[in-house]
C-alpha cells in the first residue's frame, strides 16, 4: 500500500500547477523557437511548451538539407540561426569525421564563399544551436507536456484564458501561439480548419485535388511534373499473385482507383523519416531487419526492379537510378536522406488518420512508419531479390550512433509534411504562389515550388500499380504571405496566432511549408502578439503599417 501511495504522489505532483506569461507558445518546432526568442527580445515574458522531449521539430529531426527556394527572402531570427550554424562549422574542432575541405554541399543549399550563413547541418548541431539561442534569452521551456485536447482550452469572451495539459498543469497568458505541425491548439480552441485536399474549383486552382495524371499545368500554363516523377516504371503488377486479381491486392494499395481529377478528398501527402545516415565505420549502425518484418510489404519494390529487365541504369532519368532515395550530404560524413521514385521512404496512404488521431493512435502511426522504413532499408541493403549493385550501394550506409536518443539511431520526429490547415478570413492559394494575386499585408515570404508528395497508391486502367498526388510546379519568384493567413477569424478567437498550420490551400501550403519559412512566420507571430498586448487589442485589429515597421526593424524580408 505504501508503494502505491508513493507512486500516486509522484504521478500527481504537477497536477493543478499554474503558470502565467504574456505569450504562451505551444509547440517548440523551429517556428515555435523563433517565436519564443522574438517574444523574449521584445520584453514579453514567454513560456514555450513542447509535447516531446526535443525542441526544433524537423530542423533537429533530420531535415538538414534546407528546402528554401530563394535564400534572399530569409531574414531575422531564421537567418540568424543559419548564421550560427556557419559559425559552429567554422571551428575546425567540430569536424570530427572528416576535414572541412572534404565536405561538399550541393543543390539549392550550396553555400557560397561570401555567404555568412550555412544551410546544411547535422541534426544534433541544429539542436545545440537552438538550445543556445533559447538559453541566451533565458526562455522557460516545459518538455513532455501535451495539451488535453478535449477540454483543455478555456475561453472567455472569445479569448483563450488558459490551456490545460494532460499532466494537469495550467498555462495562462495574454496571447497564445500554436506552432505545432498538427494544429492541436487551434482545433481545441474551436477554430475553423480543414484536412486533406480541396477541389481545384474551390479557390480557382489547377493543381489541387486528385492528380491522377503524368503532367499538370499551372494557372500560367507552366508544366507541373506530377505522376511523371516518384512513380513506378511501366508494368508493375499490383496483385499478390501476379496477373491474378482474385489473389488480392498487395499491401498498401488503395481500392477503388484514384478518384476524379481535381476533386477534393481527405487524403494527406505521405510522411517519412528524414534519415540521418553515415558511411563512417566507427559511427555506423548497420540496418537491422525488424522483428515483425513481412517480405510481402516490399513485393512492389522487388517487382519494380524486376520490371527493368536488367537495365537498372535506365529505370529513371533523374537522381541515382539504382537507389530510391535522395542522399544529400551533411557535414561529418552524414546525410539527410529523403524519398525519391516510386517505392521509397514515403509510406504512401498510411497517414490519412494522423491529423485527427488521438495521441496514442498517432504514436502507433509513427511506429508503423518507422517499422516500414526500417524494413525498407534492410531490404535494399541485404535482401537477395534486390540487385547486387543496389545492395552494394545501400549496405555501406547505416544510422548514426551520435545523433538521436534511440539506441538504433532512428529519430522520433516523423516528417509531418501537412496535417490540419486553418481556414481564416484569407486563404493563401495557388494564385498567390504564381503572383496572380499579391497580398498587401505581408509578414514573410515563400519561394519554394508548389510541392506535394504522393497521397495514394492504386491500380490504373491498364491494371498496373501507380502513385497519385505528386505535384512539382515551379514558382517563378518569391511571394508574400498574408498577415490574415496566420490569425483566425475574429469571431472564433481574438488572441491566437497560427504560424505553421496557417490558412492555406493544400497546394499553396505545399510551397509555404518549409522550415525557414516557418521560422519567419514564428517570428512574425511573436511581433503580432507583442503589439496586441501593448495595445490591448485583438490580434486581428493591428494597424498593418505599424506591424510592417516592426517586422522590417526586426529583419524580416517582405518584398
Show where each model-derived region lies.
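Positively charged n-region of N-terminal signal peptides that target proteins for export
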Residues: 1-4, 100
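Sec-dependent N-terminal signal peptides
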Residues: 3-13
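Beta1/beta-strand and adjacent pyrophosphate-binding region of the FAD-binding site
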Residues: 18-29
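N-terminal Rossmann-fold NAD(P) dinucleotide-binding loop
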Residues: 32
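Aromatic pocket-lining residues of Rossmann-like dinucleotide-binding sites
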Residues: 39
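Conserved N-terminal/central alpha/beta ligand/cofactor-binding core
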Residues: 44-45, 50-154, 194, 202-204
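Flavin (FAD/FMN)-binding glycine-rich loop and adjacent Rossmann-like elements that form
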Residues: 127, 169-175, 179-558
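Conserved beta-strand-loop-beta-strand element in the redox core of flavoprotein oxidoreductases
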Residues: 151-170
Amino acid at each position: 500500500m505504501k508503494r502505491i501511495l508513493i507512486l500516486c504522489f509522484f504521478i500527481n505532483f504537477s497536477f493543478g500547477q499554474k503558470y502565467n506569461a504574456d505569450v504562451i507558445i505551444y509547440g517548440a518546432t523551429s517556428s515555435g523557437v523563433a517565436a519564443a526568442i522574438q517574444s523574449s527580445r521584445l520584453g514579453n515574458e514567454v513560456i514555450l511548451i513542447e509535447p516531446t522531449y526535443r525542441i526544433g521539430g524537423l530542423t533537429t529531426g533530420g531535415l538538414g538539407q534546407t528546402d528554401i527556394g530563394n535564400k534572399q527572402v530569409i531574414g531575422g531570427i531564421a537567418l540568424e540561426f543559419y548564421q550560427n550554424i556557419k559559425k559552429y562549422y567554422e571551428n575546425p574542432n567540430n569536424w570530427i569525421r572528416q576535414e572541412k575541405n572534404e565536405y561538399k554541399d550541393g543543390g539549392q543549399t550550396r553555400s557560397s564563399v561570401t555567404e555568412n550563413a550555412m544551410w546544411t547541418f547535422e541534426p544534433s548541431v541544429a539542436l545545440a544551436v537552438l538550445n543556445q539561442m533559447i538559453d541566451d534569452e533565458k526562455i522557460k521551456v516545459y518538455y513532455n507536456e501535451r495539451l488535453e485536447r478535449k477540454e483543455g482550452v478555456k475561453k472567455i469572451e472569445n479569448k483563450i484564458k488558459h490551456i490545460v495539459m494532460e499532466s494537469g498543469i495550467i498555462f495562462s497568458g495574454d496571447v497564445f501561439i500554436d506552432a505545432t505541425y498538427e494544429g492541436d491548439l487551434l482545433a481545441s480552441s474551436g477554430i475553423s480548419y480543414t484536412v486533406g485536399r480541396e477541389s481545384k474549383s474551390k479557390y480557382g486552382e489547377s493543381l489541387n485535388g486528385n492528380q491522377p495524371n503524368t503532367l499538370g499545368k499551372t494557372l500560367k500554363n507552366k508544366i507541373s511534373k506530377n505522376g511523371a516523377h516518384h512513380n513506378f516504371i511501366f508494368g508493375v503488377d499490383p496483385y499478390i499473385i501476379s496477373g491474378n486479381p482474385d489473389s488480392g491486392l498487395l499491401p498498401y494499395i488503395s481500392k477503388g482507383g484514384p478518384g476524379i481529377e481535381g476533386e477534393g478528398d481527405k487524403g494527406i501527402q505521405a510522411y517519412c523519416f528524414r534519415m540521418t545516415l553515415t558511411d563512417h565505420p566507427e559511427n555506423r549502425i548497420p540496418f537491422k531487419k525488424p522483428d515483425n518484418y513481412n517480405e510481402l510489404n516490399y513485393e512492389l519494390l522487388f517487382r519494380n526492379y524486376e520490371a527493368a529487365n536488367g537495365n537498372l541504369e535506365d529505370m529513371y532519368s533523374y537522381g541515382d537510378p539504382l537507389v530510391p532515395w535522395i542522399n544529400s550530404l551533411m557535414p561529418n560524413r552524414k546525410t539527410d536522406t529523403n524519398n525519391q521514385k516510386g517505392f521509397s521512404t514515403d509510406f504512401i496512404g498510411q497517414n490519412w488518420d494522423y491529423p485527427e488521431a488521438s495521441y496514442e493512435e498517432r504514436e502507433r502511426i509513427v511506429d508503423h512508419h518507422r517499422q516500414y522504413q526500417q524494413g525498407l532499408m534492410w531490404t535494399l541493403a541485404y535482401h537477395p531479390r534486390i540487385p547486387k549493385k543496389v545492395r552494394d550501394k545501400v549496405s555501406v550506409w547505416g544510422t548514426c550512433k551520435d545523433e538521436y536518443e534511440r539506441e538504433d539511431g532512428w529519430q522520433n520526429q516523423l516528417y509531418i509534411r501537412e496535417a490540419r490547415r486553418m481556414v481564416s478570413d484569407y486563404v493563401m492559394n495557388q494564385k498567390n504562389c504564381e503572383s496572380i494575386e499579391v497580398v498587401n499585408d505581408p509578414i514573410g515570404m515563400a519561394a519554394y515550388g508548389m510541392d506535394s508528395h504522393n497521397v495514394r497508391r492504386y491500380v490504373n486502367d491498364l491494371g498496373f500499380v501507380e502513385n497519385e498526388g505528386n505535384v512539382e510546379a515551379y514558382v517563378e519568384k518569391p511571394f508574400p504571405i498574408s498577415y490574415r493567413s496566420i490569425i483566425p477569424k475574429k469571431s472564433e478567437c481574438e488572441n491566437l496566432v497560427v504560424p505553421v498550420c496557417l490558412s492555406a490551400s493544400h497546394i499553396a501550403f505545399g510551397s509555404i511549408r518549409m522550415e525557414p519559412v516557418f521560422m519567419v512566420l514564428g517570428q512574425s507571430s511573436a511581433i503580432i502578439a507583442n503589439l496586441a498586448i501593448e495595445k490591448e487589442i485583438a490580434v486581428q485589429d493591428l494597424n498593418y503599417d505599424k506591424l510592417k515597421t516592426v517586422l522590417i526593424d526586426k529583419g524580416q524580408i517582405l518584398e
